[in-house]
Amino acid sequence: CKSSRVHFVGRLSDEDLKLHHYAAAVFAFPSVTKNEAFGVALAEAMYCGTPAVTFTIPGSGVNWVSLNGETGIEVPNGDDKAFAEAIDKLIDDKELSKCYAENGMKRVRDNFTIPKMVEEMEKCYRELEG
């Protein structure tokens, strides 16, 4: 499926996926249930500098990964109209999109990379040692 602004590209290799994230104007993350416990795809897109649009999902990690008004736009769960409007807003407002993209890259680097996870694990082990 392809339109002037939306592309469904099907299955991609990891390398092609990364290139698509870097090229995308917006990452629309359509999950509406807690089944998406963390949102790895969301973090991957943010790491590549793609601002996100998400739904509010109480109790999930999605809204912990992307912060409303800081790294992207969060809309009420199931509000498709607000979701579409948020996508349009990020496409139309280049400055806002750039700000969210930069904040998103920093958030992922500071919290969700392997070196950061190793650092946090080492800290836990040191605390256990006493």
What positions do the PLM features span?
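Short hydrophobic beta-strand element within catalytic cores of glycosyltransferases
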Residues: 48-56
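Short alpha-helical donor nucleotide-sugar binding micro-motif in glycosyltransferases
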Residues: 11-12, 19-24
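Conserved acidic donor-binding segment of nucleotide-sugar-dependent glycosyltransferases
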Residues: 67-80, 89-95
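Acidic donor-binding loop of glycosyltransferase active sites
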Residues: 22-37, 50
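A short, well-ordered alpha-helix in the C-terminal region of glycosyltransferases
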Residues: 82, 89, 96-111, 117-123, ...
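Short glycine/acidic-rich beta->alpha loop that forms part of the nucleotide-sugar donor binding site
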Residues: 34-39, 46, 58
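Short alpha-helical segment that forms part of, or immediately flanks, the ligand-binding pocket
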Residues: 18, 40-47, 63-64, 70
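Nucleotide-activated donor-binding/catalytic signature segment of Leloir-type glycosyltransferases, i.e.
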Residues: 1-12
